[in-house]
């Protein structure tokens, strides 16, 4: 039977960190939410392609490491519209939500869409119910790892995914 996960509750938003003073000046950039297993792979490729990138990350120790490596990073919870504004969401061209918490991802997507209606929004999901939820929050594309694995394996056998 297919597991049907429900979106997880989001922790209360912490107060905004004090190391974000002025909004970033980047424009036509990609904003990446989360620099974990998925986000770090995306970040590496965007850097290799020299695409303008701003990362929003909640873990302070990771923020410091990313900044030391020369990346543009906003420290905070991206579910806060203030944190998104700090990353200059209004001038971004794409938002990639690479975090696993689908409820928080939905909040991020809703705030981002309100701030920038033409933004391309890509999101990660871990279950069918999360795919549906994130699409209702106005994500343009929602990718579920298990579906993609199955699709690629079937394609390797010359079979369509459906």
Stretches with model-predicted labels:
Residues 1-162:
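Cytosolic regulatory regions of ion transport systems
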């Amino acid at each position: 039977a297919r597991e049907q996960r429900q979106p997880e509750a989001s922790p209360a938003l912490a107060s905004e960190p004090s190391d974000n003073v002025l909004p970033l000046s980047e424009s036509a950039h990609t904003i990446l939410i989360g620099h974990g297993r998925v986000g770090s792979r995306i970040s590496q490729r965007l850097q290799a392609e020299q695409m303008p990138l701003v990362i929003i990350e909640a873990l302070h120790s990771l923020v410091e490491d990313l900044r030391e490596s020369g990346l543009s990073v906003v420290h905070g919870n991206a579910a806060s519209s203030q944190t998104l504004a700090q990353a200059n969401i209004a001038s971004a061209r794409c938002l990639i939500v690479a975090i696993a918490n689908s409820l928080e991802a939905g909040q991020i997507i809703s705030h981002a869409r309100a701030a920038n209606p033409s933004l391309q929004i890509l999101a990660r999901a871990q279950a069918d119910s999360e795919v549906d939820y994130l699409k209702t929050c106005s994500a343009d594309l929602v990718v579920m790892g298990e579906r993609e694995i199955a699709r690629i394996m079937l394609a390797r056998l010359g079979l369509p995914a459906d």
